[in-house]
């Protein structure tokens, strides 16, 4: 189905706003990720430092190619503490189809939390629609009222008692993030072209995890070629491209 038709249906059902910009460009997800990251790490993270990318650049063929390779495309927000700062990013991501979070569909949302003692835990539920939204708003109001009616000395601070809660934490720019990449390109249908591309990637120390090469459509002179890479910095990938 065409993206515009699906978006109109989502708007008619109340799952997307009349102005869908915040929904389809990842801005709403980035707002939520900033709040969740602040609570998780006990420090005030800033929304404007969150890398944000929406779903408008995804084409239907990308969904099909991902499934053929054993993945599903999900719009994911990632907040992760690493040795030199915090990764804070929202963008489409390929998730192995066997993972639970890859099977979160429709209006359902999920939050995957990885902690030291418990390991990974998944929280799953409806994330759009009038009733789920109303439920969340009422829950927030109840929390505010409880805080106001609790003696000040017994209140738990929003950022708990983290020793560096007010410190200036380093949010890594997207250029410094290391992750695997999905590349779709069109190559001339002749011997040696794919080898040339792999050499360019290899010259930048980018290792290839998988290659998917499709047959040309009709009399087309170019063929779609899909590369999955191993982890590499965004800056390195951009340089190779």
Enumerate the language-model features and the residues they cover.
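Adenosine-phosphate binding glycine-rich loop
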Residues: 1
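Substrate-binding/catalytic subdomain of NAD(P)-dependent oxidoreductase enzymes
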Residues: 4-103, 108-110, 129
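Catalytic-loop motifs flanking and including active-site residues across diverse enzymes
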Residues: 29, 133-136
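Glycine-rich phosphate/pyrophosphate-binding beta-alpha loops
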Residues: 55, 119-121, 125-131
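Structured core elements
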Residues: 74-75, 89, 112, 122-124, ...
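Low-complexity, glycine/alanine/valine/leucine- and proline-rich hydrophobic stretches
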Residues: 91-116, 130-131, 202-220
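C-terminal transmembrane helices and immediately adjacent loops/tails
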Residues: 115, 121-123, 143-146
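A conserved regulatory-domain signal marking ACT and ACT-like small-molecule sensing domains
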Residues: 136, 141, 145-241
């Amino acid at each position: 189905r065409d993206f515009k038709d699906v978006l109109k249906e989502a708007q008619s059902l109340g799952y997307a706003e009349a102005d869908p910009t915040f929904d389809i460009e990842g801005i709403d997800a980035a707002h939520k990720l900033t709040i969740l990251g602040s609570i998780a790490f006990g420090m005030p993270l800033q929304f404007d430092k969150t890398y944000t990318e929406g779903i408008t650049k995804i084409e239907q063929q990308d969904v099909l190619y991902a499934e053929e390779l054993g993945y599903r495309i999900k719009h994911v927000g990632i907040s992760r503490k690493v040795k030199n700062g915090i990764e804070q990013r929202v963008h489409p991501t390929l998730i192995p189809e066997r993972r639970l979070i890859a099977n979160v569909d429709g209006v359902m949302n999920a939050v995957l939390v990885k902690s030291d003692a418990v390991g990974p835990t998944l929280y799953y539920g409806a994330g759009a629609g009038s009733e789920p939204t109303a439920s969340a708003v009422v829950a927030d109001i109840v929390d505010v009222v409880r805080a106001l009616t609790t003696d000040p000395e017994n209140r738990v601070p929003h950022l708990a008692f983290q020793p560096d809660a007010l410190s200036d934490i380093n949010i890594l720019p997207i250029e410094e993030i290391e992750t695997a990449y999905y590349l779709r390109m069109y190559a001339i249908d002749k011997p040696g072209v794919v080898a040339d591309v792999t050499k360019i990637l290899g010259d930048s120390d980018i290792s290839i995890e998988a290659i998917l090469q499709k047959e040309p459509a009709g009399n087309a002179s170019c063929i779609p070629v899909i590369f999955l890479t191993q982890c590499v910095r965004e800056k390195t990938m951009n340089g190779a491209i």
